[in-house]
C-alpha cells in the first residue's frame, strides 16, 4: 500500500510506482508463490482487509501518510492478529536509537525496512514463506535490510525491549534489475484519471542536502 488521504483532495496524486517496483521485484523471484494486491486509496484496502485478511501487509511511510499507514496496520491486526505488518520509506530515522523509539511509538508495526525496499521486502517475504507463517520463527533471527522490536519483548518496559538490526543491503545499481511495473501491467488499475504517472531514471544523488534522503551514503 502507498496510501493517500482522499477525504477532501488527494495528498499524493501520483501513480504508486514505488510499490509497483517492489511488487514487480518480488514477483520476479517468487512468481506464483505469492499473491500481491496493490492499493492507493484507504477505503479500498480496508474493504479488502475485511473481505480477506492478509497474511502480510506492507505500507509506505512518508511524512504525509505515516500515521495513516499505522492506522491501517491496526485494522489489519484486528482482522488477523497474526498478520505481519511492514513499513518502509523515507519517514524513518537513520540512527538506530531513534529507529527503536520510532517503532515503540507505532505498536502495530512489526518490521521496518531500511532504505530501498525491493531487496529488503523480498527478504521479509522469503522469511515468512520459510517459516510457514509461524510468527515465532519469523522473528527468531535478524532479517536482512530490516529492523524490528522482538515481539516477545514488546510487553517489557521500553528500555528492556530488544531491538533487532538486520544486515545492511547494497543499493540496486542497475534499475533494469527491477521489471517495469508499467510494462507488466501491475499498475494498470491506477490509471483512473486522478493519478499522474511518473518515471524513475536513476537512484542516488551526488549531493547531501539535509532535507532529502536521496544522497544518503549507504
What is each stretch, according to the model?
Residues 4, 16, 140-143, 195, ...:
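A structure-centric signal for secondary-structure junctions around beta-strands
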Residues 3, 16, 54, 81, ...:
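Proline-rich low-complexity regions
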Amino acid at each position: 500500500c502507498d496510501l493517500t488521504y482522499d477525504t477532501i483532495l488527494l495528498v499524493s496524486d501520483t501513480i504508486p510506482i514505488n510499490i509497483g517496483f517492489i511488487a514487480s521485484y518480488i514477483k520476479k523471484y517468487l512468481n506464483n508463490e505469492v499473491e500481491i494486491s496493490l492499493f492507493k486509496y484507504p477505503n479500498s484496502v480496508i474493504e479488502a482487509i475485511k473481505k480477506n485478511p492478509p497474511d502480510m501487509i506492507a505500507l509506505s511511510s512518508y511524512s504525509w501518510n505515516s500515521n495513516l499507514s499505522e492506522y491501517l496496520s491496526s485494522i489489519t491486526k484486528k482482522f488477523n492478529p497474526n498478520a505481519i505488518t511492514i513499513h518502509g520509506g523515507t519517514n524513518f530515522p537513520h540512527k538506530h536509537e531513534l529507529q527503536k523509539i520510532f517503532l515503540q511509538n507505532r505498536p502495530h508495526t512489526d518490521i521496518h525496512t531500511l532504505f530501498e525496499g525491493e531487496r529488503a521486502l523480498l527478504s521479509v517475504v522469503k522469511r515468512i514463506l520459510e517459516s510457514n507463517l509461524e510468527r515465532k520463527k519469523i522473528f527468531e533471527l535478524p532479517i536482512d535490510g530490516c529492523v524490528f522490536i522482538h515481539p516477545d519483548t514488546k510487553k517489557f518496559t521500553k528500555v528492556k525491549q530488544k531491538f533487532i538490526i538486520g544486515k545492511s543491503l547494497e543499493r540496486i545499481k542497475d534499475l533494469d534489475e527491477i521489471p517495469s511495473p508499467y510494462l507488466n501491467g501491475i499498475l494498470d488499475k491506477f490509471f483512473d484519471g486522478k493519478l499522474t504517472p511518473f518515471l524513475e531514471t536513476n537512484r542516488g544523488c551526488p549531493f547531501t542536502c539535509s532535507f532529502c534522503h536521496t544522497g544518503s551514503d549507504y
